[in-house]
Design a protein with these regions (language model features):
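Transmembrane helix-loop boundary segments of multi-pass membrane transporters
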Residues: 62-72, 146-157, 178-189, 320-324, ...
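Terminal cytosolic tails of multi-pass membrane transporters
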Residues: 1-37, 413-437, 455-511
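Membrane-interface loop-to-helix entry segments
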Residues: 158-210, 215, 245, 268-273, ...
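TM-loop-TM module centered on a large, flexible mid-protein loop between adjacent transmembrane helices
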Residues: 105-107, 112, 144-150, 223, ...
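Hydrophobic transmembrane alpha-helices that form the core helical bundles
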Residues: 58-59, 65, 75, 84-167, ...
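Helix-loop-helix connectors at the membrane interface of multi-pass transporters/channels
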Residues: 104-109, 114, 135-161, 195-198, ...
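Helix-loop-helix junctions that connect adjacent transmembrane segments
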Residues: 72-73, 149-158, 187-319
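Transmembrane helix-loop junctions in multi-pass membrane proteins
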Residues: 55-60, 173-178, 316-317, 379-396, ...
């Protein structure tokens, strides 16, 4: 099918809905996962992974120091627009290749094996780092809640214990099958939206004092140690960019989604724009309610939004709203485990991981990649272990997440642009807007990848260093070393599924 001049990113009206199982066979894979997720569930998983109640709350303190209210609010508006371009461009390629492998499969088909290999490793380690970052963040917030409610001061050991319990919970929930995952993600959507409404509503109604609109939209604050305000504003954009990540989850769950060639693409785009609007409301509501800026920025709770709630609503009100945030983080981590495990399954299916024959196994009862789920949470646990000894280690885990996932989004889009008319779009496409939106997306990702690697505080020390560049180097070195070891075993299918070898391979992959 060739692109149409219709600029609207909607399915072409003259096309019949594809048989998704047959389409998957055409892409070279036997359907082994249960296709029980609807369009809303597919949107819900990306919305849950983006999780404005997780990202905005966790990095709000970073925003207070790095540009302040003006950069947080206007940065969110601007970054959201560019991220929407990335999502639109990625959704178009997803419609053409609706597989669990998602980004790396797209890159492999459009650019060759090496492109697919490096994209896959960036995406995989980014997803595993995201599980560690999200669930460890939830453990930190749980510690703040315990301190606020019962005066219990969390230690690195207790935080790690809570983190491991959360990981175990998410693993078990994902073993029950995609129907439960889809249900939890659907609940998560309304929990997030209702939570934002409740938090903002309470902060608007209850406190006697509010900041002026001039303060919220124009106040610039620099506590980074850097003198250049443009530089500070640029790195301040990372609050929004970090939050707007993980929307590739819709693509990773496409083999379990009905009408995936349309629903997965819609899921990506809807998750971004709904998060964009709701996140702006949340940030504005928090900022208007700040009672004492410096006290909030340096709060003993370690969680500035908790201090805003405490000052404006009292201990009981703050505890209740903090609990809403913690539950939202749990929804977020559960969705991330689902996405990461599908990536592990798909990458193993194509022979890219050590012990691939183990990790690609699918339960015949629940039709879920059981071994991939356990591997995902186990690696996430290992990534977070250094946090027992250093708070800086948590920053490094976050760096692995963002520096892995962010460039991986742009690679399939760049290769699609390079392919030109050789690219055959699916039923969901951008028409004549494909190239301008695509180049905007690639340019933005290139810019923010550089921003992610810049030092965020001065002077640069072991404790303040930005480890994103180190994480990127480590990922690329590991991927290169393993390429020379495993390149003979790795490969996406070059023909439709149905050969005797393929059937034998997958017969032993069902447990």
């Amino acid at each position: 099918m060739s692109p149409t001049p219709d600029p609207s990113p909607v399915p072409s009206p003259g096309l019949p809905q594809q048989d998704e199982e047959q389409r998957l066979r055409e892409l070279g894979y036997r359907p082994v996962l249960a296709r029980r997720m609807g369009g809303f569930g597919n949107f819900a998983i990306s919305f849950s992974v983006i999780s404005i109640l997780s990202g905005c709350m966790t990095l709000y303190g970073f925003g207070l120091n790095t540009g302040g209210p003006a950069v947080m609010l206007w940065g969110w508006a601007g970054v959201g627009l560019f991220v929407l371009c990335v999502g639109l461009a990625l959704a178009e390629v997803t419609s053409a290749y609706p597989t669990s492998g998602a980004l790396y499969y797209m890159a492999d088909r459009l650019g060759g094996r090496r492109w697919g290999w490096y994209t896959g490793w960036l995406n995989l380690l980014g997803l595993l780092g995201a599980i560690a970052g999200i669930d460890y963040g939830a453990a930190l917030f749980a510690g703040a809640f315990a301190n606020l409610q019962w005066g219990v001061k969390p230690t690195p050991g207790t935080t790690m214990l809570v983190f491991c319990v959360i990981l175990l919970l998410h693993a078990v929930l994902n073993l029950f099958g995609v129907r439960l995952v889809s249900l939890l993600n659907s609940v998560s959507v309304w929990w997030h939206l209702g939570g934002v409404a409740l938090i903002v509503g309470a902060l608007v109604i209850v406190p006697d004092h509010h900041r002026s609109a001039s303060f919220v939209f124009t106040e610039f604050v620099n506590e980074t140690g850097w003198d250049n305000q443009v530089y500070v504003a640029a790195i301040g954009l990372l609050l929004a960019q970090y939050t707007f990540s993980g929307y590739d989850a819709s693509a990773h769950l496409s083999e379990e989604t009905s009408h995936a060639s349309v629903a997965a693409s819609r899921g990506i785009v809807r998750a971004i724009w709904v998060s964009w609007l709701a996140g702006f409301v949340l940030l504005a509501g928090l900022t208007f309610a700040i009672q004492d800026y410096d006290a909030t920025r340096t709060t003993d709770t370690g969680v500035p939004p908790a201090q805003i709630m405490l000052d404006g609503l009292g201990t009981d009100g703050a505890s209740a709203l903090l609990l809403i945030v913690i539950v939202a983080q749990l929804f977020c981590g559960n969705a991330e485990v689902a996405a990461a495990s599908r990536m592990v399954f798909a990458f193993s299916r194509d022979g890219a991981l050590p012990g691939s024959h183990l990790w690609r196994k699918v339960s015949g009862r629940t039709q879920t990649p059981v071994a991939a789920v356990w591997l995902s949470v186990s690696v996430a646990c290992v990534l977070a272990l250094p946090s027992l000894y250093s708070a800086t280690a948590y920053n490094a885990v976050t760096a692995i997440n963002v520096i892995g996932i962010t460039p991986a989004y742009a690679i399939p889009v760049l290769l699609r642009l390079r392919a030109g008319d050789r690219f055959r779009p699916g039923p969901w496409h951008l028409g004549r807007w494909s190239r301008p939106v695509g180049w905007t997306a690639v340019g933005w990702v290139a810019c923010v990848t550089v921003l992610f690697c810049l030092p965020q505080a001065s002077p640069v020390t072991v404790g303040t260093m930005n480890y994103a560049s180190v994480a990127l180097a480590v990922v690329l070195v590991l991927a290169t070393v393993w390429w020379f070891v495993a390149r003979r075993s790795y490969g996406t299918p070059s023909a439709p599924y149905g050969s005797g070898r393929d059937q034998a391979d997958f017969a032993e992959g069902i447990v």
